């Protein structure tokens, strides 16, 4: 069995969660010995689409079984780019077009599975399978932590809270900014960027007025970001809507306490005080971060790590293998 892992605009994916998911798919297939290609001109037995127009999918379906990866929903498109309200009806139609013609759909969580199955055009099976996490990549390495603290010139005992994501209102960066304002003795760092044209006026204004204890370095990769996850005192992810939240998996894999917004996607696999700390507003977020900074969270951290062990690259590879075998049977 050989798979075409297909995505248009591959060069643009690197800085996004979809880009990391695409990379994880490659690693997962390698882990279970499934041959793949990213070249549509190559030979293969089935197609696993991440990003494509419906016309491209229809073309693939004439010859091959096609899996469409359900990275996006109408819900997680809201409050993202500037002019999202104008684009939303067209985006919804796009989702209908691609999900409605898939032979099988893979999506990261039972929550996103429910949302996709609720679309009246979806007739194919929908499989919930995590985007996965490379546990080895987020293992604690002192040299990464040193690179992180040196990069930002942090004092040895300086408390640090990090957030990661594109500069969408949906990601809750404005709340990250306001929580930072209430904790002037803690350094808050948000990793991620977005072009000014795509950033909403609301977010640009909040960023312009961010407090002095908040740093925004833009997109950072390599040792510095790995060191940030391992070396921070807390990962704070106040997103309003996710299909999974790879940042959350990265925080748990790094064995760093995670504070996040209590939203539906986490309801059935991340529990408050057992794996993470969940809040509903900035007042609660501030209190929870203070709790992380001053109380031992060892038990919660270990419980959280068990969650990502179940979403390791190897286990995702086995899940993909099963999905591929299923779609081949469907197409026969």
From Swiss-Prot:
Names of the cofactor(s): Mg(2+)
GO MF term (any one): 1,2-diacylglycerol 3-glucosyltransferase activity
GO CC field: plasma membrane
Main location: membrane
Localization: Cell membrane
Alphabetical list of InterPro entries matching this protein: Glyco_trans_1, Glyco_trans_4-like_N, Glycosyltransferase_grp1
UniProt keyword Cell membrane present: yes
Pathway membership: Glycolipid metabolism; diglucosyl-diacylglycerol biosynthesis
Record text on activity regulation: Activated by the negatively charged lipids phosphatidylglycerol (PG), cardiolipin (CL), nonbilayer-prone 1,3-DAG, 1,2-dioleoylphosphatidylglycerol (DOPG) and 1,2-dioleoylphosphatidylserine (DOPS). Inhibited by 1,2-diacyl-3-O-(alpha-D-galactopyranosyl)-sn-glycerol, 1,2-diacyl-3-O-[6-O-acyl(alpha-D-glucopyranosyl)]-sn-glycerol and 1,2-diacyl-3-O-[alpha-D-glucopyranosyl-(1->2)-O-(6-O-acyl-alpha-D-glucopyranosyl)]-sn-glycerol.
BP term (GO), one: enterobacterial common antigen biosynthetic process
Keyword Cell membrane (UniProt): yes
Recorded catalytic activity of this chain's protein: a 1,2-diacyl-sn-glycerol + UDP-alpha-D-glucose = a 1,2-diacyl-3-O-(alpha-D-glucopyranosyl)-sn-glycerol + UDP + H(+); a 1,2-diacyl-3-O-(alpha-D-glucopyranosyl)-sn-glycerol + UDP-alpha-D-glucose = a 1,2-diacyl-3-O-[alpha-D-glucosyl-(1-> 2)-alpha-D-glucosyl]-sn-glycerol + UDP + H(+)
Keywords assigned: Carbohydrate metabolism, Cell membrane, Glycerol metabolism, Glycosyltransferase, Lipid biosynthesis, Lipid metabolism, Magnesium, Membrane, Transferase
Pfam families reported for this sequence: Glyco_transf_4, Glycos_transf_1
Catalytic EC class: transferase
Domain of life: Bacteria
The EC number(s) this enzyme carries: 2.4.1.208, 2.4.1.337
Protein's job: Processive glucosyltransferase involved in the biosynthesis of both the non-bilayer-prone alpha-monoglucosyldiacylglycerol and the bilayer-forming membrane lipid alpha-diglucosyldiacylglycerol. These are major components for maintaining the anionic lipid surface charge density, for balancing the bilayer to non-bilayer phase equilibria and for keeping a constant lipid bilayer spontaneous curvature (curvature packing stress).
Protein family: Belongs to the glycosyltransferase group 1 family. Glycosyltransferase 4 subfamily.
Protein's name according to its UniProt entry: Processive diacylglycerol alpha-glucosyltransferase
Species annotation: Acholeplasma laidlawii
